[in-house]
């Protein structure tokens, strides 16, 4: 059912709890590489296969000296750097980061991530509200060029 502003008074007073069967994705970095998405992004991306309808979680790997494709999307992203150092280019602003830092990517901002190390892997967790935007029919992603 789709609601409009006229349906505001029809909000339920009770909630029906629905606990999904799948509540855990074990060994994410060993079981869930998203081959097509990784190829498009030009770096390894591991996607948590969980039933969230509003949030996604991925782990990204950037090899030494590697840079992702430049892209933008209609959903927000927060990245937490697990290990490594580098920078994220957000529009024309260079944001330097290292392990322990969190980086915010705003909606529809061109961005790309770079590992500045010549020897060490970079690993990061990305949390996005992409499933929410997909369910609302408002998710858009564009690669640069």
Language model regions located:
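Glycine- and acidic-residue-biased ligand/ion/polar-headgroup-sensing regions
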Residues: 75-86
